């Protein structure tokens, strides 16, 4: 049990909690800390030489604060000193130790990036969700969203990030990368992520988002014609899938006022399932504030997205009043 500080006693008498503190308590309860620490442990410095390293769980908690609140390394360090809720979540007691500095957090983040540990966190969470019945098999919803990147050339290199590209969405030009996701059609939880430059069409990454046991795939009208693509036709499993793609509204037949428009009824039924893919995007963009890339290049941002979607899956599960225990 953690030692109580004067701040803990003072804050315990408050009449209400902030939304930030409530969110951190939800995540603290649902994250499988022992499993995540075990994933990091083989790659973490042993401390046999030099200064003893900070605890793995402490650094992981500090990194999660950075990811969830979209903070810089220095901003995360300052936030822990400023915010009681964040300090409590990380587990820092100023009577015993100071918060890890920005450089220590930077080295920890690079450790996660170098060994692709965020993907291991994501896969571990999804494996448990399948085993406990929270994520079912058989159906996937596919979609993609653009994450903006700085388009300016006013920097030391006088050029944009070469791994990002521009694309036109509607009447607006966007510059950045595109995040493609495959979502479980039953639960709305993300099971697969693919990251590409923004100019790659949504339909090009579809084959990588489909699971081996999927029988049905839902998508918006941007995925029309998916069943005719070479990578789909040439694959025995992918060619046998039922692709329920929404048609464009302009292609639907018009009927008289007194008749039932069955085309629209069918499209509405598809949309009622397909809309589940928008919920994870709302969490990472609106709750976690990840509307712009945090780093240069696709690899580092992909690593961050794995943690964001792992956290989004856990938050969605907790928000519905469930836990990682068996659903039945």
Residue ranges of predicted features:
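Polybasic low-complexity intrinsically disordered regions
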Residues: 2, 65, 74, 78-82, ...
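Amphipathic, well-packed alpha-helical segments that form the structural scaffold of globular domains
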Residues: 37-45, 126, 281, 285
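Charged, often Cys/His-bearing segments associated with DNA-binding zinc-finger transcription factors
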Residues: 1-34, 319, 323-328
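Structural motif
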Residues: 49-57, 296-305
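Basic, short loop/linker segments at the boundary and entry of helix-turn-helix/winged-helix-like folds
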Residues: 16-64
């Amino acid at each position: 049990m953690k030692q109580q500080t004067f701040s803990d006693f003072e804050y315990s008498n408050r009449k209400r909690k902030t939304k930030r503190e409530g969110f951190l308590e939800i995540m603290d309860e649902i994250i499988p800390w022992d499993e995540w620490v075990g994933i990091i442990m083989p790659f973490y410095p042993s401390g046999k030489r030099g200064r003893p390293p900070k605890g793995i769980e402490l650094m992981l908690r500090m990194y999660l604060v950075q990811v969830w609140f979209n903070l810089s390394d220095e901003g995360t360090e300052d936030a822990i000193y400023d915010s009681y809720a964040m300090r409590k979540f990380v587990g820092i007691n100023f009577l015993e130790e100071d918060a890890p500095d920005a450089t220590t957090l930077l080295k920890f983040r690079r450790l996660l990036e170098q060994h692709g540990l965020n993907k291991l966190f994501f896969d571990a969470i999804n494996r448990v969700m399948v085993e406990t019945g929270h994520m079912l098999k058989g159906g996937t919803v596919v979609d993609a969203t653009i994450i903006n990147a700085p388009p300016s050339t006013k920097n030391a290199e006088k050029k944009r990030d070469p791994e990002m590209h521009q694309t036109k969405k509607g009447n607006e030009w966007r510059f950045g990368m595109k995040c493609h996701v495959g979502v479980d059609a039953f639960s709305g939880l993300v099971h697969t992520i693919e990251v590409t430059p923004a100019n790659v069409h949504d339909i090009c990454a579809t084959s990588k988002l489909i699971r081996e046991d999927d029988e049905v795939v839902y998508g918006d009208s941007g995925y029309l014609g998916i069943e005719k693509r070479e990578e789909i036709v040439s694959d025995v499993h992918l060619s046998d899938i039922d692709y329920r793609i929404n048609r464009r509204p302009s292609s639907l037949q018009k009927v008289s006022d007194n008749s039932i428009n069955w085309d629209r009824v069918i499209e509405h039924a598809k949309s009622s399932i397909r809309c589940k893919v928008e919920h994870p995007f709302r969490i990472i963009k609106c709750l976690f504030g990840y509307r712009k890339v945090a780093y240069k290049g696709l690899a580092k941002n992909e690593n961050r997205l794995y943690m964001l979607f792992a956290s989004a899956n856990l938050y969605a599960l907790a928000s519905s009043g469930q836990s990682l225990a068996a659903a039945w």
